[in-house]
């Protein structure tokens, strides 16, 4: 938070939080460079009254603190997975395999309706190709539908005792030992 009053109130920890923010941004940039697909889509938040009856649906925005924690969690999950892989001991990985080529071809056909042209057939694709599509439609009216259809073209992540990497994160090693933020 760049609010002067807030920074002054927490002046003892502000330098540490500034360093954490800088490190988090470096980790985000590193993941982007290697091709991570970022599905940072606003989520729906259902508001309920005292009786538990829904009264409204609002967009839930992710804050900087949540992004910072997520960045460190991803780094921790990757580091632990790589460590155990190198130890060659039994371990459970969170794997996300490359999308099936037929699903990707369908997605590529779909996005051509929005004027996007993708080179290739969907065989042996790198995550950065999909990342570039995300970047092209960022802020456009069709961003939500294209991101949703891209997500649906992917395989589901799962747990496995064999390290198969994580396609969406463009990570060679990944596990899931941290708890969800939400």
Segments and roles (model prediction):
Residues 1-182:
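Electropositive polyanion-binding surfaces
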């Amino acid at each position: 938070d760049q609010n002067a009053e807030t920074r002054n109130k927490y002046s003892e920890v502000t330098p540490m939080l500034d360093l954490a923010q800088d490190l988090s941004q470096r980790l985000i940039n590193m993941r982007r460079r290697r091709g991570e697909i970022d599905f940072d889509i606003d989520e729906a938040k259902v508001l309920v009254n005292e009786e538990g009856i829904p009264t409204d649906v609002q967009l839930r925005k992710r804050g900087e603190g949540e992004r910072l924690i997520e960045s460190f969690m991803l780094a921790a999950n990757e580091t632990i997975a790589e460590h155990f892989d190198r130890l060659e001991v039994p371990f459970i990985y969170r794997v996300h395999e490359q999308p099936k080529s037929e699903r990707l071809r369908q997605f590529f056909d779909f996005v051509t309706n929005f004027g996007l042209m993708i080179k290739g057939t969907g065989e042996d694709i790198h995550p950065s190709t999909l990342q570039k599509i995300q970047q092209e439609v960022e802020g456009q009216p069709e961003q939500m539908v294209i991101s949703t259809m891209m997500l649906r073209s992917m395989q589901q992540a799962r747990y496995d005792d064999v390290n198969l990497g994580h396609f969406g994160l463009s990570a060679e090693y990944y596990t899931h030992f941290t708890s969800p933020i939400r």
